[in-house]
């Protein structure tokens, strides 16, 4: 599943091809996505793209006549290609540009979304979202304060989009390892000092992932559909039974909040 770094890398990759150019057509081949694609997406046709933003895992393609809201879901990916490129299976939407290019949205599982929001109106799905993790709005004081009296596992707590957006499963595992915190520990039983460390490691792993993803930006202009996700060194995620690189003890795995969780019982307390 694309997580925040992958979506941010997508934004960085497609932005130069969109901003300042005009959307000539929005071609919808399949409307049955996570939510039905509305007819109103056509309202951006003939409009110049003024900005491409990200909020949580939503991409916002802004024009004077409204905003297209994209979500990659479980399996979605974006390609900037020649508009004449033959369609392949699961190519559900094209945002065709005046340059002869198009932004093509491919989504095999159809859990993604393409929605329209009129100018100066409220975007309901962005309600109740916490701060972006790489901004100053996300700090250890907020995290510690909101954690008080929370009995659930700290991993679930930091993955709650009302607390902070975009800390998906991979990066929650990695941040907790670097902070030395057991993901099973109750969020309310962690000290302010340890939340300071955890806030720093969340920012660290997300920033590093985005930086590493920057080397794949060339993929967004290719026709082979490479998603632009990036291989990176992971300390615990997906490494059940392998030795911890810090202490040598075998990495353990447990399902927490319906997600596989990986940790070292020696390094994480």
From Swiss-Prot:
Swiss-Prot/TrEMBL cofactor(s): Zn(2+)
Catalytic site positions: 2 (schiff-base intermediate with dna), 3 (proton donor), 57 (proton donor), 259 (proton donor)
Cofactor: how and how many bound: Binds 1 zinc ion per subunit.
The organism's place on the tree of life at top rank: Bacteria
Residues binding DNA, per UniProt: 90, 109, 150
InterPro entries linked to this entry: DNA_glyclase/AP_lyase_DNA-bd, DNA_glyclase_Znf_dom_DNA_BS, Formamido-pyr_DNA_Glyclase, FPG_cat, MutM-like_N-ter, Ribosomal_uS13-like_H2TH, Znf_DNA_glyclase/AP_lyase, Znf_FPG/IleRS
One GO term of the biological process aspect: base-excision repair
Family: Belongs to the FPG family.
NCBIfam families reported in the protein's UniProt record: fpg (TIGR00577), PRK01103.1 (NF002211)
Protein's recorded name: Formamidopyrimidine-DNA glycosylase
Species this protein is from: Alteromonas mediterranea (strain DSM 17117 / CIP 110805 / LMG 28347 / Deep ecotype)
